[in-house]
Amino acid sequence: MAARQQALDAAYAAIKRRIILNELKPGDTLTELGLAKELDCSQGTVRESLLRLQADGLVVRSGHRGTMVTDLDPEVANELLELRRRIEARAARRAAERVTAADLAALVELQARMDAAAAAGDEYGLLALDIDFHLAIFRLARLDALEQILVRCILHTHRSKLWAPRHRRPLAQTSMRHRPILAALAAHDGAALARALEHHVDTIVDVAPAEQAS
């Protein structure tokens, strides 16, 4: 059972990585047989991975058309960004009340790992740690029913960000942007944490002033 779960997790992670990095592009058709050969796993493992990716909003499965990578619709991206902003801000006060010293130590370690990924130029690794960081804070609020929605929002944010290379920050800056969030959480200041998270989401893509005004 453990080996089967490891194979499923590995296949899911591999396909997700290719979608996020735009190696599998919007509209691409994915076949279970083809992916099974590429990933050296069973079609059943691929099928389960695609179901998880559908829950993430990264693929859509249709009986007669197969499985396709979802589009990156700018309007949908903006809606998901706003939804993410609201979910994280809503969780902030509860998280600030419940965070423990052990929780903070784990988040400090995540921040250090983000710094290391940035220094190594590992953009995808940094994005994966970013998800871990935000979910670790969100889970303190114990709003389990909203977690899958938040994951979907964050993954879509990452895809959109990687599609806007002109507005991407240096990786070191991306990592450092999490420090004000961590500081507010360490102070158990729910209002400050909500503001820090809202600012973080609002400024994920570093848009040029002329484009902000348009």
Give the label of every model feature segment.
Residues M1-E97, A102, L135, R139, ...:
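Short linear motifs at protein or domain termini
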Residues L80, A101-L162, M176-A184, A192-T203:
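Conserved amphipathic alpha-helical segments that form helical-bundle/coiled-coil interaction surfaces
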Residues A96-E97, R142, R166-H167:
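Short helix-capping/hinge motifs at transmembrane helix termini and TM-loop junctions
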